[in-house]
Amino acid sequence: MGVAAVFTAVQSDLGALVSEASNSRSADIDLMTTAQILACMNAEDRKIADAVAAELPAIAQTVDRIVAAIGRGGRLIYIGAGTSGRLGVLDASECPPTFSVPPGMVVGLIAGGDTALRTSVEAAEDDEATGAEDVKAIGLTTKDVVIGIAVSGRTPFVMGAIDYARRIGAFTAALTCNPGSPMADLADIAISPVVGPEVVTGSTRLKSGTAQKMILNMLSTASMIRLGKTWGNRMVDVTISNRKLADRATAMLRDATGCSADDARTLLDQSNGSVKLAILMQITGCDADAARANLEAENGFLRKAIERAEKTPPQS
């Protein structure tokens, strides 16, 4: 579908969307007790994981494209409005401390800019030209992947960004909660979990927002695992930026290698706070320079670097 036709489709009846329908199970929610309200919400929330599971093939395809993009020097770009935009910014902001990636590798853009993170800027989502301008302003290239996030699947700001990304040749995905949406037609791939009507009609920050958060978790986490940012399930690329993370790094190093707390702290000091380097040094007996060389030779994959170091005799 061409972009003009897609934008025309956005004018269709909002009430026809799954996410805007009335939920019969919560029709009398204003008459319920507190316990009944919570039970109703909890029962609806139980449906979210199954809805996400149905989209795993599309999520997997998107992860593979993200991994390939970052591997060739590209970026993962999230863009959305309102709650959807905030969730994208949240996921992007967690990647540098969790996986030690550069801040610009995973980018979150929200309609209305940073002000919209704390204060709603509702009208900002209606301008498709601004969506295109925002991704253009960050120097979007064909190497990048753009994930447009909008529950309705028809937010003009997000559609403008997706349209621009496609026109320059960047890979695009639409994360919506309405299958067959205009955004789904516009993007290269659609991820559309059907969570059903909300307990408060149209309040898509509820089930829909939770589904989006789960999927964003998958997109970033699975991509980083594929890029060698973990060793097993250990978060070995964590950035030590506070006392809690320093304690976590020490505990991780002790658990991974069996060394003492004092040895762990010494290794982390010698490795300049790199858990990966410290583990490699302790397991293989390499010094920091040799460990770093082995990691670089294996593109940061610790498991492969350990195997490489163990096959390489230490230099006298």
Swiss-Prot record:
InterPro entries: Etherase_MurQ (IPR005488), Glucokinase_regulatory_CS (IPR005486), MURQ/GCKR (IPR040190), SIS_dom (IPR001347), SIS_dom_sf (IPR046348)
GO BP field: 1,6-anhydro-N-acetyl-beta-muramic acid catabolic process; amino sugar catabolic process; N-acetylmuramic acid catabolic process; peptidoglycan turnover
Any one GO molecular function term: ether hydrolase activity
Catalytic activity: N-acetyl-D-muramate 6-phosphate + H2O = N-acetyl-D-glucosamine 6-phosphate + (R)-lactate
Gene name of the encoded protein: murQ
Coiled coil: none
Enzyme category, top tier: lyase
Keyword Plastid: no
Protein name (record): N-acetylmuramic acid 6-phosphate etherase
Additional observations: A lyase-type mechanism (elimination/hydration) is suggested for the cleavage of the lactyl ether bond of MurNAc 6-phosphate, with the formation of an alpha,beta-unsaturated aldehyde intermediate with (E)-stereochemistry, followed by the syn addition of water to give product.
Source organism: Jannaschia sp. (strain CCS1)
Family in the record: Belongs to the GCKR-like family. MurNAc-6-P etherase subfamily.
Ranges for domain SIS: 66-229
PANTHER family for this protein: GLUCOKINASE REGULATORY PROTEIN
Pathway membership: Amino-sugar metabolism; 1,6-anhydro-N-acetylmuramate degradation; Amino-sugar metabolism; N-acetylmuramate degradation; Cell wall biogenesis; peptidoglycan recycling
Job description of the protein: Specifically catalyzes the cleavage of the D-lactyl ether substituent of MurNAc 6-phosphate, producing GlcNAc 6-phosphate and D-lactate. Together with AnmK, is also required for the utilization of anhydro-N-acetylmuramic acid (anhMurNAc) either imported from the medium or derived from its own cell wall murein, and thus plays a role in cell wall recycling.
Nucleotide-binding among keywords: no
